[in-house]
Amino acid sequence: GLLVTKDSFIHDLEMNFRELDNLGFRNDNKYFIPSYEWYNKEIVVWSKEMGYTPINYTPRLRTAADYSYPEMGKRYLSSDDIEMGIWKESKQPNGLNGFIVLVHMGTDVRRKDKFYDRLGKIIDQLKKEGYQFVDIRELLQ
């Protein structure tokens, strides 16, 4: 079952895009990652009716765990562990080609090792290894 009605979903999505627009972020690509990456067939259908496509990050890459903090116990993943996962995945036969990476813009204050502080170094190294970073529209065409 769903936790939201179609009307509340449509209203919420429209308000979120309106707020992003007010802040100067244009979402002309029509892709979005649903809150908590939670969605099902109905959400996909409703999104498509609005002209949007829900997407998700690529599994296996644990960057989305950058929101976690030590008090979460087994669900916590340190920035060292997240980064090691990136380098491990990059060494696989297809590497990180085509990966959609989710990194949170902000995290809980209880997380002291902010993964986003490492992004510049990681991106620079991946570029040296030949990776290119592309817009989601280019990736999914």
Q: PLM features: residue spans?
A:
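Catalytic domains of cell-wall/extracellular-matrix polysaccharide-remodeling enzymes
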Residues: G1-L102, G106-K127, Y131-Q132, E138-Q141
